[in-house]
Curated annotation (Swiss-Prot):
Alphabetical list of Pfam families matching this protein: ABC_tran
EC number: 7.6.2.-
Record family assignment: Belongs to the ABC transporter superfamily. Heme (hemin) importer (TC 3.A.1.14.5) family.
Gene: hmuV
Name by which UniProt lists this protein: Hemin import ATP-binding protein HmuV
Record note on quaternary structure: The complex is composed of two ATP-binding proteins (HmuV), two transmembrane proteins (HmuU) and a solute-binding protein (HmuT).
Gene Ontology CC terms: plasma membrane
Lineage: Bacteria, Pseudomonadati, Pseudomonadota, Gammaproteobacteria, Alteromonadales
Signal sequence segment: none
Residues holding ATP: G31, P32, N33, G34, A35, G36, K37, S38
Length: 251
């Protein structure tokens, strides 16, 4: 991503963003409301055609990719996994087969593989609307992983506040799954979060945005300094020491 900028009228939403995302790692996008986090994800999905600058996947400009081909390499896990139709869980996951060219048997094997990977294979024949919020989010994760199964590049998984509607236990399960996917399967995972402690625990790299600009970038220890937290979130943080090697809790 090079010199990416986007404005609505006179208001700069993204300003000269230059960043590279690495396969096999989790990058957390942090910042207050209106900082440009979700807009950055939309730009990656080619949902902002008027944005200036360039975004490349491999050596190719993302804008030159046919949408059906891009869908094989890049997918979004939405903030709210809302489906009201009475599909079964395996039918929801099978929706991810849409951009792929597979036989029925191969498709079913993929659905089973990813349901097992995210820990909900036992729910395969359950009606999707009857699931809990955390179960729905894991089913949706299995769906997008199915979609990315034929990617010619290390797949890119975008998570836009994926834990905002979940209880604490489910939040940690979803983020732990995302981190495992990055490290085990070489996915490029980019996640929008508001919780600094979750970002510190589950990301390899943090990008802090304020008013559409990157103000800090690096490992959680480097990027989330006291000065940055004061500058971006305008409050005095309290750090509680953690065991050696762990990131301290921030309050």
């Amino acid at each position: 991503m090079d010199r990416l900028s986007y404005a609505i009228g006179d208001k700069a939403v993204l300003n000269n963003i230059r960043v590279q995302f690495q396969p096999g790692s989790v990058t957390a996008l942090l910042g207050p409301n209106g900082a440009g986090k979700s807009t950055l994800l939309k730009a990656l999905c080619q949902e902002i055609p008027s944005a200036q600058g360039s975004i490349k996947l491999g050596h190719c400009q993302l804008v030159d990719w046919p949408r059906a081909e891009l869908a094989k390499s890049l997918a979004v896990l939405p903030q709210h996994a809302s489906l009201t139709f009475p599909f079964t869980v395996d039918e929801v996951v099978a929706m991810g087969l849409y951009p792929l060219t597979l036989s029925q048997k191969e498709g079913q094997q993929l659905v089973t593989k990813w349901l097992a990977e995210v820990g909900v294979l036992h729910l395969a024949r359950r009606s999707y609307p009857t699931l809990s919020g955390g179960e729905k989010q894991r089913v949706q994760l299995a769906r997008v992983l199915t979609q990315l199964s034929q990617s010619p590049f290390p797949p890119i998984l975008l998570l836009d506040e994926p834990t905002s509607a979940l209880d604490l236990a489910q939040q940690h399960k979803v983020l732990a799954l995302a981190k495992n996917l990055a490290h085990k399967h070489a996915y490029t995972v980019i996640v929008v979060l508001h919780d600094l402690n979750q970002a510190a625990r589950y990301s390899d790299r943090v990008i802090v945005l304020k008013q559409g600009e990157i103000v800090s970038e690096g490992t959680p220890n480097d990027a989330l300094s006291i000065d940055i937290i004061r500058q971006v979130w305008d409050y005095e943080p309290e750090f509680i020491p953690a065991p050696q090697g762990d990131y301290p809790l921030i309050f």
